[in-house]
Amino acid sequence: MGGFTSIWHWVIVLLVIVLLFGAKKIPELAKGLGSGIKNFKKAVKDDEEEAKNEPKTLDAQATQTKVHESSEIKSKQES
């Protein structure tokens, strides 16, 4: 009752898959699934790298803005 723990469950599932798709179609489906997973992992990795680089850029811009604003305030106070 705990799901697919028996070997017979897996045998029946595999038999149904072979009957539905045919023996020739299964390698093509597996190849497509594998390339989809590969592309997904690559996209996740690219997003993580982009996220690592993005805060540094924002912090640098914020620091430059603060320095520029504080120098303007000092120049106004001195005049």
From Swiss-Prot:
GO biological process, one term: protein transport by the Tat complex
Protein's UniProt name: Sec-independent protein translocase protein TatA
Family listed: Belongs to the TatA/E family.
Entry annotated with the keyword rRNA-binding: no
GO molecular function: protein transmembrane transporter activity
Principal cellular location given in the protein's record: membrane
TM stretches of this protein: 1-21
Bilayer topology term: Single-pass membrane protein
Pfam families registered for this protein in UniProt: TatA_B_E (PF02416)
Skewed-composition ranges (Basic and acidic residues): 66-79
Protein source organism: Helicobacter pylori (strain ATCC 700392 / 26695) (Campylobacter pylori)
Superkingdom of origin organism: Bacteria
Gene that encodes the chain: tatA
Cross-referenced NCBIfam families: tatAE
